[in-house]
Amino acid sequence: MLEGLNDRQKEAVLYNEGPLLIIAGAGAGKTKTLTTKIAYLIEEGLAYPYNVLAITFTNKAAKEMKDRLYGIIGDLAQKVQVSTFHSFGLKLLRENYAKLGYEANFVIMDSDDSLTVVKKIVKDLGYDPKIYNPRAIRNKISSCKNEMMTPEIYERYAVSDYEKVMHKVYEKYEEKLKKNNSVDFDDLLLLPIKLFKENPSVLQRYQELYQYILIDEYQDTNEAQYILSKLISAKSRKITCVGDDSQSIYSFRGANYKNILNFEKDYKDAKTILLEENYRSTSTILDAANQVIKNNTQRKDKNLWTSRGKGEKIKYYRAYNERDEAQYVIRKVKELRNKDVEYKDIAVLYRTNAQSRVLEEEMLKENMPYRVIGSFYFYSRKEIKDLIAYLRLIHNSKDNVSLLRVINTPKRGIGLKTIENLTIKADEIGTSIYDAISSGKELEFKKTIEQLKSLSEELTLTELIDKVLDASGMRQELESEKTLEAEVRLENLEEFKSITKSFEEREGLVSLEDFLLEISLISDVEEYKDDPNRISLMTVHSVKGLEFNHVFVVGMEEGIFPHMNSLMETSELEEERRLCYVAITRAKDDLHLINARRRTLFGKEQINPVSRFIGEINKDLIETNVKEEELPKQEKKIDTEVMFREEDVDYQVGDYVYHETFGTG
């Protein structure tokens, strides 16, 4: 059973005397180690299968672990409790619902259901949903629950008017759920903790049942998961936590990397084992990752190594702009294809979703098959399709398809019945739906479109986009949500202005009709959707857990990666560095780090310095490809020294600038 394990992995499998922390670097075989440890406990008679609780973070990871166990111990694997935290919480609720005041047929609400409840409460309490955005409140309730903050606790900290309203809604929300015999997704963690704290005998029963607790990806645990882990393991103290503090990149979801850093404080007698041998990457790639992450202060000291050999140097390219950056990727992909490399072995990583747009356009021009993982194709994203529908309606008011898409987007109180009646009326009088509008809220919508029509004749395309985002309410709706998802969608809408700006610079003053024709030619990606052999485009957050032979990381600039929002906070900058570590360690054989001297992003041109993360890698690991003569002939070279001259500069509000201490902003 221990065959094929290295000495550190064997040590981790064989140690079962008390708390164990396994710090497993990227590609160090942690899943294999964890699975073998479970099998060893059972095969050696140290535990019955039902005495083992293994927690993973995704259903996919749980299935993979279960399948591996089947391969080692056969049908006994069926009796091992392998699940996510939420699945385990649900099991506890089903077995103890009465003690928490629920009936057997309690309902689990999904995020859409809980949002519907919050919307109704906001309306019933008489609050303006434009000020007290239901989605923002729903997300805040979720955060509160993950931080173990009940309505009673939250009330103590509610000072502002908004927080007091938030407390009232939270309180009513909990009352409504209990009254309807319902729980939400976050309750699957919160209620088991409540159950254990209020019923010591129930806690003792589960502590005696689960004598060995193993938790994967411990660096990603939030407060509720951390407390649940401590409660269930308090008696046996035979808890094994596996993770890598250097890969903790989900703080925006409530994950607290300090849980793994504080493990030895929580369990004074804990043993720590480092898994540092990497089976994925070349030593050059690992040396680069080690050199970057060592600049973080909040970390466990470890050093990844491999017996694979040095491999190729890391390729660095400083492009002229984002278009040149994408074209570099295209050139290198073509070279790889000439060496019989398959598209599916290639990944392009970026910090924000909006960066995929230029890459997608260039790949479409070259007929290169690609897939966007963890998101939609840029032109398929809902907010982009909504914006294009507005533009099409402004251009052609007879476009019923576009009108039906946006007449109540964002919501403006025009219901399905009204729309149905309008459609019938238009059919009866033989006209477009737009022309059939004559009263009500739909007439206000029509007036907005008419105003935008007039403006379209005097504004540039980029200026028109800004007016559409404001007049339609799209920008206000997303800004009021105060969620990460809304922030990403807003970034995508702002990035659309880069398309119009680029189009205007290339073609001069153009009509809305010409622009709509242009994007209709580049937004169709259906041809390759069923082909598994495609290049993978994704954010660094989406790539965790994956690996590719050839990896391109684009946008390696200050303000992009690391992200502008992180530059003023040490903790956030360290998370950006962990993200960079994750990006680097996805590459098996071949890594390209790319940036641009100038970049048009969100409709604004930026001149960004090279990312500090590139500067943290020893130059002897890097093969540089920066050739001034390769700059596009029609564009001027930038004298970067101008950025640092001691003379007055005419700055305007909205300009992006670089400061030696504060970075880009």
Q: Across the structure, where does each feature detected by a protein language model lie?
A:
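Inter-lobe coupling/hinge region of RecA-like P-loop helicase motors
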Residues: 2-6, 10-24, 50, 100-107, ...
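P-loop NTPase Walker
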Residues: 1-104, 108, 115, 204, ...
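Conserved RecA-like helicase ATPase core segment
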Residues: 2-4, 28, 36, 40, ...
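Conserved helicase NTPase motor core
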Residues: 3-14, 18-22, 53-54, 61-62, ...
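ATP-hydrolysis module of ASCE/P-loop NTPase motor domains
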Residues: 16, 77-80, 98-187, 210, ...
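Conserved RecA-like ASCE P-loop NTPase motor core of nucleic-acid helicases/translocases
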Residues: 47-59, 80-82, 216, 242, ...
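Conserved helicase C-terminal RecA-like lobe
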Residues: 159, 342, 356-368, 381, ...
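Mixed-charge, Lys/Arg-rich low-complexity intrinsically disordered regions
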Residues: 624-656
